[in-house]
Structures are given as structure tokens and as C-alpha cells.
UniProtKB/Swiss-Prot annotation:
Homodimer. The dihydroxyacetone kinase complex is composed of a homodimer of DhaM, a homodimer of DhaK and the subunit DhaL. ADP binds at H37, G38, A39, N40, A78, S79, G115, M124, R161, D174, P175, G176. It comes from Lactococcus lactis subsp. lactis (strain IL1403) (Streptococcus lactis). Coiled coil: none annotated. Induction: Induced by dihydroxyacetone via the DhaQ-DhaS complex. Keywords: ATP-binding, Cytoplasm, Glycerol metabolism, Kinase, Magnesium, Metal-binding, Nucleotide-binding, Transferase. This is PTS-dependent dihydroxyacetone kinase, ADP-binding subunit DhaL. It is found in: Cytoplasm.
């Protein structure tokens, strides 16, 4: 279960993972997007960490709300609104429960509502849904996350910028799926 300290630790680890993989995320985004997913996420998480360092929080909900507001205002493209919506929904859920499955469910619902995407459309919904299922069946692991990331390459994009490529979107890993994998890998490191 998340606490104030473990939540901040999780976000710090996620930031490190994003910074380390900034170029790779943008490389993934190049063929099927604007090529800026890594730069956008790195900037957003850097700003998020700055915001967390200068704030005092009474609960996990307040942390998630700060993350949401920062990502929505600092991350360009679709990633800011999608991740921001997820963290905002998680902040509302965290008022009632800190159950990891419930938090991820809230985030997934918000992403689906914002992006109007379903499972199988080569979006971050695929990995959020798979991770939620794994949490609910006590089978969440880094290996399972990596399988979902790799499987995204075989999907036809029907949402977002990648959908403009049609069949040419097949064969490319979805960058939002990869960045979400980093989010969940680092969560597992903290709550395991």
C-alpha cells in the first residue's frame, strides 16, 4: 500500500527511468508520432519532481493532484492530458482507498474517457488494462509488462497520431505503452 513516502519514492524512480530513457522514448515516437514523447515526459517529470520538492503533503491524494496539475501544464502532446487525467482520477480515489488496483483502475478509466480508446488500439490503455488485470490476479511483474510493450508493436493503431499511418503503424512499439511500463515497473519496485 502506498504512503506519502513510498509515493514520492515511486515518482522519483519513475522520473529517473524517464530521464534515462528519454532518447529511447523519442526514438520510439519518431516513426509513429512527433518524435517528442521522451523529451515531453522528461520535461514533465523533471518539473513534477521540482514541484514535489517544494511542497508538503498531508496525504497521497494531494501528491497525485500535484503530479496531475504539473503534467497537464508541462507536458506537450497527448501525454500530458492523458497522464494528467490518470493522476487526477487517482487523486480522487486515494481519498477513499490506497489499494493499488483501485488506483490503477481509476487512472485507466480516466485515460479511456480522455482518449476515447479501448484495449487493442495500440495506446497506453493496453498496458494500463493488462497491469490492472495482473494486479487483480497477483501476477504483476516486470516480465509481464515487457510482454505487453513488445505486443504493442504487432497492433494496428486506431487512435492518436499513429492511426494516421494505418498499416504502417504495425511493427512499432507504442511509446506511451513503454513510458507506462516504466511507471508500473517502478511502482512494483516500491510496493513489492
Amino acid at each position: 500500500m502506498l504512503t506519502i513516502d513510498t509515493t514520492i519514492e515511486w515518482l522519483g524512480k519513475f522520473n529517473e527511468k524517464i530521464q534515462e530513457n528519454k532518447a529511447y522514448l523519442s526514438e520510439l515516437d519518431g516513426p509513429i508520432g512527433d518524435g517528442d514523447h521522451g523529451a515531453n515526459m522528461a520535461r514533465g517529470m523533471s518539473e513534477t519532481m521540482k514541484a514535489l520538492e517544494v511542497s508538503n503533503f498531508g496525504n497521497v491524494s494531494e501528491i497525485f493532484k500535484k503530479v496531475a496539475m504539473t503534467l497537464m501544464s508541462k507536458v506537450g502532446g497527448a501525454s500530458g492530458p492523458l497522464y494528467g487525467s490518470a493522476f487526477l482520477a487517482m487523486s480522487k480515489t486515494a481519498i477513499e482507498t490506497l489499494d493499488t488496483s483501485e488506483l490503477i483502475y481509476a487512472g485507466l478509466e480516466a485515460i479511456q474517457k480522455r482518449g476515447k480508446a479501448q484495449v487493442g488500439e495500440k495506446t497506453m490503455v493496453d498496458i494500463w488494462s493488462a497491469f490492472l488485470n495482473d494486479l487483480q490476479t497477483d501476477s504483476a511483474s516486470k516480465d509481464n509488462l515487457e510482454k505487453v510493450v513488445k505486443a504493442s508493436a504487432g497492433l494496428l493503431a486506431t487512435k492518436g497520431r499513429a492511426s494516421y499511418l494505418g498499416e504502417r503503424s504495425i511493427g512499432h512499439i507504442d511509446p506511451g505503452t513503454q513510458s507506462s511500463a516504466y511507471l508500473f515497473e517502478t511502482l512494483l519496485e516500491v510496493v513489492a
